[in-house]
Amino acid sequence: METAVAYYKDGVPYDDKGEVIITLLNGNPDGSGSGGGGGTGGSKSESSAAIHATAKWSTAQLKKTQAEQAARAKAAAEAQAKAKANRDALTQHLKDIVNEALRHNSTHPEVIDLLMPIMQRCRQKQSGCALQKQKKKPVKKRKRAEKSFQEAEQRRKEIEKEQAETERQLKLAEDEEKRLAALSEEARAVEVAQKNLAAAQSELAKVDEEINTLNTRLSSSIHARDAETNTLSGKRNELDQASAKYKELDERVKLLSPRANDPLQSRPFFEATRLRARRGDEMEEKQKQVTATETRLNQISSEINGIQEAISQANNKRSTAVSRIHDAEDNLKTAQTNLLNSQIKDAVDATVSFYQTLSEKYGEKYSKMAQELADKSKGKKISNVNEALAAFEKYKDVLNKKFSKADRDAIFNALEAVKYEDWAKHLDQFAKYLKITGHVSFGYDVVSDILKIKDTGDWKPLFLTLEKKAVDAGVSYVVVLLFSVLAGTTLGIWGIAIVTGILCAFIDKNKLNTINEVLGI
């Protein structure tokens, strides 16, 4: 029977009992921590849909709990309000009694009362007693009401804490649900594999800790057994000595027994009998000590056998856990490979789409030239930056004569409005296509250098920046960077020609002479 995932904590799946669940991509969810053979069963893996469904179930359960807690909070608030009203009513009643008594006692006496002080004191005494009797019952009721109110207040605070914790867990569950919904199928598979690997590693760590504890106990028990063995050897030697002395005295008693009835010669017999009895007691005590030591030794030996059996079982569990880790690692590697292949496919599709766009906008010839530049950049080393700059400047001067300043400023206006998140997306796609690592942060430097050209007219800082990156990461990175500029911004025909000219200057200067023809300039 499969174990359902109730929730995730720190990336590790747990069931509704709080136990870690190990889910192999080619096996069943397993919350028991046992099993063998590396979990190579033929049942289906936990799919991303199941993970997503679990997240939704967890959110729904928390919302249900939240509603139940809200109902309990409402009931507690009503109980508290009722207790408070009861307490306040009793408090007011008690105040009324006291005020009535004080009003009665504060009445000014008549002349006759002044003449009869004894009668007045009696009335006051009777009034005080009545007041005490009248107050006693409401005071007890008020104390009970106050206790009920405090209990209701305590319960209200406890429910508030429960609600706050449920709200926190609900937010985490909702965030997890949203995050899972945003993942691709391959990315979810990677996440499942990562969580399964983490769970398997956690299980192995627990087993290793258990084995270490058992080994410590085994070492201690063996030490105790050795000590008891030495003690037993000593006790047996003492028993043998006591037995020998007893036998010696027993033989003497037997030898002297014929004289036992002779008053003149019976004394040696009775002395030997007394000594034999004492030696018998000593021998019995030594036997008890030997028996007790043997019992302890047997207990320790039994404990050692139990520990050794537990270690054997733990080692079997460890072998299973290691096998699961290997399977989880293999599954993770497979999932990561599938994800990478999917990303590369997406990148290739995006790149092909990019070339198709180039074909539609600038013709097949330009698209073909762009592909040739990309292919030539693979593994190519940077050429002399001054030579590249000189070749580019020559091409640029010819190009500038064909375009107005407004046309030339289009590239600067486009880069000033660039959205770096779009650029980063294209940069990542082209980088995967050429199998290199792309960093959009480097693009900020390039954009900054290009924007400065509008004011300075100096292209050398840009070429030095590109040269440095080409030296560090290869010419392919320059291609990736500039292709992402072409894909992510609208540069105008002059901008397209300039970017292409930069690429040709670094990769193939001979193509500088064909750019205008290819673009139809």
From Swiss-Prot:
The protein's topology relative to the membrane is: Multi-pass membrane protein
User: Known Pfam families for this protein?
Assistant: Colicin (PF01024)
Query: Coding gene?
Result: cea
> What is one term from the GO cellular component aspect held by the record?
plasma membrane
Bias class Basic residues marks the residues at: 133-145
Protein name in UniProt: Colicin-E1*
Q: Which domain of life is it from?
A: Bacteria
Q: Which InterPro entries match?
A: Channel_colicin_C, Channel_colicin_C_sf
Instruction: Give the GO molecular function terms.
Output: pore-forming activity
Q: Where is the composition biased (Gly residues)?
A: 30-42
Q: What does this protein do?
A: This colicin is a channel-forming colicin. This class of transmembrane toxins depolarize the cytoplasmic membrane, leading to dissipation of cellular energy. Colicins are polypeptide toxins produced by and active against E.coli and closely related bacteria.
Sorted keywords for this record are:
Antibiotic, Antimicrobial, Bacteriocin, Cell membrane, Membrane, Plasmid, Transmembrane, Transmembrane helix
Primary location class: membrane
**Which parts of the sequence are annotated with region: Disordered?**
26-52, 127-163
